[in-house]
Amino acid sequence: MLRFVSAGESHGQALIAWVSGFPAGVPVDLEFIQRELHRRQLGYGRGARQRIEKDQPDIIAGVRHGHTIGAPIAVRIENRDWANWEKALPVEDTEGADDAQRPLTAPRPGHADLAGALKFNFHDARYVLERASARETASRVAAGALAKLLLREFAAEVLSHTIAVGHARLERDAAWEEIETVCKNLESPLRCVDGTAEAKMKAEVDHALRAGDSVGGVFEVIAHGIPPGLGSHAQWDEKLDARLARAVMSIQAVKAVELGSGVSNSSSYGSEVQDEIRYDAPSKRFARSSNRAGGLEGGITNGQDIVVRGYLKPISTLRRPLLSADMKTKEAVKAAYERSDVCVVPAGGVVGEAMVSLELAAAFLEKFGGDSLAETRRNFDGNQKQLDAF
């Protein structure tokens, strides 16, 4: 069973990504993992933290001579900002540590600060902030890059693009080739396939910046080349659409998830929603005239592109803070301010790619198994022959 967990705090020594259940023999491209981490740091509206961190992946277990070895994989990502926080967040209770602390007692509305402090009985939300921070997503992207490398062995690709920032929206569907092109362009400010729509999105970010505010939006993740038959209708927790929704919903600031055109489908008639089926003789596969289901029916992949959208609220930290209550004095105060971003939608899309890739890789290995890449490939090839003969 493929499993991913992470460890580390925003201003701690490092972040750790730990992946188990990965087959042996998968080629590991460090430059690709590095590029994925770099993509997460990009985007119009990101904050100063991105100029500090370099996010170099340091694989410390599970890979030898450029290939996975079937053991758990551990990736370490150094926090360069730790140098500025070492005295405030020491591991040991050293003399003078109290004087160096940077307490946070004015919880930010919308953040985990107060809920986490109540849960763990902290009267300082610093420890909650440190783990709840979206800095943690660097470990997700590192793990997701490994999942992408596995999926690529079977000609499957997962990418994302921005379809909305604030009130500005891409008012058309994007072709896969357009998404490929914009993802290759690391200079694209918001990773939107349409220049006119992107200019309007930038204006939304500029407005929020001038107002001391933040702005949310929507990213769309597309998984291309995924074979039919992943997931299952047989049990509620085996439905792949449910698993993908949970994976994307777990991303910081994501407050809603959509599969296919699920939102508009809810206000349409059945005859307008269902994707008609046809048989494509040259490819020996069943195909659809549309993809409103987003590549999933009954919790199972149907061979179409998988389409998942994540809806991001504006981040909680504001340069013009809202009202809060001090956790110690109980007095009305302005919420705390921490260095932050104005817009994280493009970065959210990269994290969305990672989470979708991890869930798809897990479902892929559940379907095809294999302790080594060679064994997984034999099983996959056998399934392809079965589909050809169907």
Labelled PLM ranges:
Residues 1-390:
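Generic N-terminal targeting/processing segments that precede catalytic cores or assembly contacts
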